Amino acid sequence: MGIVEGITEWLPISSTGHMILVEQVVKFNASEEFMSMFRVVIQLGAILAVVVLFWNKLWPFGLRHGRVCSKPAVWQLWFKVVAATLPVLIISPLDDWMEAHFYNYITVAAMLILYGVLFLVVENRRTTPRVTKLEQISYRDALLIGVWQCLAIIPGTSRSGATIVGGLLLGLSRACVAEFTFYLAIPVMAGASLLKVVKFVVGGSVMTGTEVAVLAVGCVVAFVVSLAAIRFLMDYVKRHDFKFFGAYRIVLGIIVLAVAAATAIF
């Protein structure tokens, strides 16, 4: 699952859509409370990969003539990331309710197919992007991308998929929206992980030694695989569009529906 998380968290193909299939094949001898927490906290490894790869662009301090100085452009970037995170904070209380009512084959398959079609439509109507550099992203752009990010609360949507579609519609270049999407993940995924851990502990649950080991290994694997996935996507979007991912999502959605039908029959 660490491999699945590391790949699917950054590519706009829905980590949930893949997780729901993996869980059909790989049966974990763990409580549902742990699995609910595990699916989210494993993202910490993926977040660390972003920090490592983009450290120079994310750290707001530097050295000039032997003295520590601030980087205004980096601070501006972080303020825009915060602006994009605000809509998520508003809807975050609905997260557990959405998972309880919509974490199922039909919802996941529907979102996979819907956003697959959206990718194809958006790419077919693409014009020359008006934003090609991160510093050109306005606070309005950031806030609207944050609104698109809220749609990822529906299982099967894909956080990166929603923000990339939103960014493309707003006129961001593929490389620009992909990189900004990576940065948005840091506060959102870190906050979601912390919230899941707190709920797990407050709920009276305790991890076994095996579960601690599983979580640790999952995070490490997600980190390593994320390094490769992020590098791949940044290189890919410089030369290609997102149509392949749109088609992939549609095919995966059909597979999820087939698995749902087979599960219901057998």
Language-model region placement:
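Multi-pass membrane proteins that catalyze or facilitate reactions on polyprenyl-/lipid-phosphate substrates
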Residues: 1-266
